[in-house]
Amino acid sequence: MRIALAACLALAAGIVIGVVGDRILGGDDKTAALRGEGMLTGLPEGPVIVRAETVVLPSGFRSRHVHGGPTFNTIESGTVEIQDEEGTNVYGPGDFFFEPAGRPHEIRVLTDARLDVIRLLPPGAEETTELR
């Protein structure tokens, strides 16, 4: 069981590093740069489902929600604003950010946006739960 969990987490980390590395090194900007970082705590225990997807959101879209597992995001195009307990940040093309599991936050799409998203979800966990 621990070996399977370690393999899943290593795979997820490899995907995140690959996506971020590709964006940093493969973009129009030939200068390598840090695109985002943070402290990831509270990894899911046991096996996780690793889900990679592309999300397209229209300008003006808003949502206050939580995720069932850590969620890693790279902005492909457009601009989004994320507001949570730590403040408000604006992200644009090439930027990377993550959302810890269970942390309430709000996304506001400033211009039509396309995000590459990787989620680590414990079995049965909801990707996203809307909050009022």
Where are these regions (language model features)?
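All-alpha RGS (Regulator of G-protein Signaling) helical domain and cognate RGS-like helical scaffolds
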Residues: 30-35, 91-92, 96-97, 121, ...
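Positively charged n-region of N-terminal signal peptides that target proteins for export
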Residues: 1-4
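Glycine- and acidic-residue-biased ligand/ion/polar-headgroup-sensing regions
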Residues: 68-85
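Hydrophobic membrane-insertion alpha-helices, especially the h-region
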Residues: 6-19
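C-terminal region of N-terminal signal peptides and the immediate post-cleavage residues
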Residues: 16-33
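A short glycine-rich, His/Asp/Glu-containing loop-to-beta-strand
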Residues: 29-64, 113, 118-121
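Conserved short histidine dyad/triad with adjacent acidic residue
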Residues: 50-67, 88-92, 98-102
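Ligand-binding loop in jelly-roll beta-barrel domains
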Residues: 101-126
